[in-house]
């Protein structure tokens, strides 16, 4: 096997705080590429009431791993995965360790913005929960490309990520 060959399949992870724009950006990226798939981590654990302290929350990781495995094993060239929990190194590693596909590359992106921008986006979304800056101040996972979304349109952020994905 040629060890210098970069796998054709790319798993693109979009992490960041709630309301930073992960889903919106990932949806746009997904439609910009042929033979692509998109999975939003929010779909993996949609429960009421939701609590970050719920010990069952990590069960959603298995759903994420399964969905990503299914897309990669179905030979999609690009798989886009957006999730707030992918901001945590240990959680991301646990999800990726359970992916059953082989020979794919992983590109990680962390979207960020100012507290003021996050608050404006939170209000615009109409979220009734209190806006938290906790995730905004987490250090990005090692190796992630950090994209500051302040004063950028969704398309500008998509184009910035697309340049990196296309060069990889």
PLM features: residue spans?
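Walker A/P-loop
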Residues: 23
């Amino acid at each position: 096997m040629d060890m210098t060959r970069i796998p054709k399949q790319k798993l693109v992870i979009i992490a960041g705080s709630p309301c930073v724009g992960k889903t919106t950006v990932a949806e746009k990226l997904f439609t910009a590429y042929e033979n692509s798939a998109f999975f939003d981590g929010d779909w993996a654990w949609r429960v009421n009431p939701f609590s970050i302290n719920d010990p069952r929350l990590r069960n959603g990781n298995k759903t994420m791993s399964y969905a990503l495995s299914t897309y990669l094993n179905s030979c999609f060239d690009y798989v886009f995965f957006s999730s707030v929990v992918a901001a945590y190194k240990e959680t991301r590693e646990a999800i990726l360790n359970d992916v059953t596909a082989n020979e794919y590359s992983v590109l990680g992106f962390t979207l960020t913005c100012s507290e003021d921008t996050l608050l404006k986006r939170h209000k615009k979304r109409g979220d009734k929960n209190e806006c938290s800056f906790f995730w905004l101040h987490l250090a990005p996972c090692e190796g992630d490309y950090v994209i500051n979304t302040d004063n950028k349109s969704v398309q500008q952020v998509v184009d910035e990520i697309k340049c990196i994905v296309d060069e990889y």
